[in-house]
Regions:
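N-terminal glycine-rich phosphate-binding loop for ADP-containing cofactors
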Residues: 1-191
Length: 191
């Protein structure tokens, strides 16, 4: 629904969707990007920010932020590589261009991370260029290191204590994470 959408068009569309397709309709304000992109990008950007804060590697974060959290098994950074870092940057730019601090309290969280800018400048767009946060060379998987701007051997896993924590009932899991002293636990609490 936009300011220029005619009410009759919405009424006709809703009648068709409910009567002919048997679907329910959720009325929403017009907003840039698909809701999944907007929520997904916000989550990915929050994760990227905390990676910088805690100094974790992308392979460890993917291990923590994937299946163990009930998310896609590919985790945050592998998912970004599959989607395409240029596509991700485009979605971020659309949000930056169409939102403002006055219209969205989370506007400042849609800043493009340094690592994403660096990879784009290098021409590393993810899976489509065979290099992004990860790069496969033969049978070896490498991960990007922002400090050296080189690829290093990947495959490091999260500390098993966090895998066990994440299997606990919600209340116990949250208490354990809130009190975690290790960087990985503090990272999980932060995201």
């Amino acid at each position: 629904n936009t300011p220029t959408t005619q009410a009759q068009v919405l009424d006709d569309l809703e009648a068709f969707v409910t009567s002919n397709l048997g679907k329910g309709v959720v009325h929403a304000k017009d907003s840039p990007n698909f809701i999944a992109n907007r929520v997904g990008i916000a989550g990915m950007l929050a994760t990227m920010k905390e990676v910088e804060n805690f100094g974790l590697t992308y392979d460890v974060v993917d291990d923590l932020s994937g299946k163990k959290l009930g998310r896609a098994s590919s985790g945050t950074f592998r998912t970004a590589d599959v989607v395409g870092l240029d596509t991700m940057a485009h979605v971020i730019k659309t949000l930056q261009d169409t939102l403002s601090i006055e219209t969205d309290p989370f506007y400042e969280s849609f800043a493009t991370p340094t690592v994403l800018k660096t990879l784009l400048e290098m021409g590393n767009l993810g899976q489509k260029t065979k290099a992004g946060f990860f790069k496969k060379v033969g049978r070896d998987v490498l991960r990007f290191d922002l400090d050296s701007k080189e690829y290093m051997p990947a495959g490091e896993k999260a500390d098993e204590v966090y895998a066990r924590m994440l299997k606990k009932p919600a209340a116990e899991r949250l208490k354990l994470l809130r009190n975690a002293e290790g960087k990985q636990g503090q990272f999980l609490w932060a995201i």
